[in-house]
Amino acid sequence: MFGADPLVFPAVFAALYAAHEVGDHWLQTHGQACGKGAPGWSGRLLCARHVVTLTAVKAAAVTVVAVVLALPINPYAAATALAVDAISHYWADRRTTLLALADWLGRTVLPGKGEFARLGDGSAAPTGTGAYALDQSWHVGWLFAAALLASLGVA
């Protein structure tokens, strides 16, 4: 079935997580952070630029880990993993999409999730808001999935 080296998943996850922290917080520009959720092409372009930079940092981190640790990572699996992660990151960072998901979950299976997403003042302290917590947990969940995908096809 699927082959996987048991060291690939944790090493790739650690690389993706570290790169995510750097790319999402240090390398994202102020303009991207403030404008990526804006409607129209301006917001889409700012979000895309952020995700391209972030994905490049993640690709570099996975490559360094693979080379330094001599890990048998399938390049096609790694590329697929990075693409899936990039798409999920773009989707969430457009903001209205993640908020709509929280609202839908709040109406159907997780009462209060939409209200949680609106906790705090994003302009005063964006890292202390419900939206930020949901955003980052979404990203980390997809890092997990990406690390698993990158582990496939290795025997």
Q: What is each of the regions a protein language model found here?
A:
Residues M1-A155:
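Hydrophobic alpha-helical transmembrane segments
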